[in-house]
Structure formats: C-alpha cells, structure tokens
From Swiss-Prot:
Chain ranges passing through the membrane: 147-167
Record function comment: TRAP proteins are part of a complex whose function is to bind calcium to the ER membrane and thereby regulate the retention of ER resident proteins.
UniProt name for this protein: Translocon-associated protein subunit beta
Subunit structure, as described in the record: Heterotetramer of TRAP-alpha, TRAP-beta, TRAP-delta and TRAP-gamma. Interacts with STING1.
Organism: Mus musculus
Predominant place of localization: endoplasmic reticulum
C-alpha cells in the first residue's frame, strides 16, 4: 500500500513538473572569423519544448559593451508576447567589433512566464565562449589574394630566368648560321 502511494505521488509530481512552458535557448556566432570593423552576426534560437505557451518572453544580452561593439542591425533586448508550445523563434543581431583582441562571448538572459499566473522563470542561453577578434590588417595579411606580392615575386624572378635565356638565344644565333641555298 505504501509503495502504491509513493508511486502515485511520484507520478503526480512528474505530471505537475511537465506542465507549463519550458524554453531552450541557444546563442551562436554565424561568422567563421570575427574581424575588427566587419559585421559579426549573432543568432539566438529559442525553442518551447513545454506543453503550454510561454508568455512575456524577454531576451536580454548585456555582454556587448557599446565602446567595443556597434550595432548594425537588430536589438540586443527583445520581447515576445508568447511562444506557442512545440515551436521556435529565431532572432538575429548584426554587430560591428570596434577593437581587436580576445573577447568572452557570454550567455544571454531569458525570462518568461511558464504559466499565466506563475512565477517568472529566468534562464540563460548557451555561451559561445572566448573568441578572438582579428585586426583588419591581420585578416588581410592572412586571407587576401596577395596580387601585389605575387607581382613583385614575378619581377624579382625575371632576371634569374631572363638572363640565361638571353645568353642562350645570343649563342644560338651566333653559332646557328643558316646554310646557303644552292641555285
């Protein structure tokens, strides 16, 4: 009898815990390289895996100080009235890094109501972690096509190829006299 009561209480607790909204949130950088002065794209994905709609959902990311990053498009603080169960929402922000160096990309905060008259639930997104922001000059040095460098290389190799070619050609012209034709 006690075992039956414990099982019923456990099932009741599990069913109560599964009611309401549950949000899973991720934050990801879409750029392969973060470069000073170039656009850096962030994407926030929020999934409602709960059984009811999440209400008054607010995403807030305070990890990008205005002295280090400029906002090109989008907002770092966003609010949705509701996110339906078994659905997702994506939000994209484009930033422009103003300084080069290492930066810790921390998680954003998400707050919502799991049920209409329930308490406010506070959560965090995933954190991309520490990443390097390359200086524009360093990025160009590593990844530009280097046309000027290749042109300079070609000009510098011309004497080592051209002088032996000219010597051979003058020698060939001197010693290869055409045979006179007999009439």
């Amino acid at each position: 009898m006690r075992l039956l009561a414990v099982v019923v209480l456990a099932l009741l607790a599990v069913s109560q815990a599964e009611e309401g909204a549950r949000l899973l949130a991720s934050k990801s950088l879409l750029n392969r390289y973060a470069v000073e002065g170039r656009d850096l794209t962030l994407q926030y994905n929020i999934y409602n895996v709960g059984s009811s709609a999440a209400l008054d959902v607010e995403l807030s990311d305070d990890s990008f100080p205005p002295e280090d990053f400029g906002i090109v498009s989008g907002m770092l603080n966003v609010k949705w009235d509701r996110i339906a169960p078994a659905s997702n929402v994506s939000h994209t922000v484009v930033l422009r890094p103003l300084k080069a160096g290492y930066f810790n990309f921390t998680s954003a905060t998400i707050t919502y109501l799991a049920q209409e008259d329930g308490p406010v639930v506070i959560g965090s997104t995933s954190a991309p972690g520490q990443g390097g922001i390359l200086a524009q000059r360093e990025f160009d040095r590593r990844f530009s096509p280097h046309f000027l460098d290749w042109a300079a290389f070609g000009v510098m190799t011309l004497p080592s190829i051209g002088i032996p070619l000219l010597l051979w050609y003058s020698s060939k012209r001197k010693y290869d006299t055409p045979k006179p034709k007999k009439n």
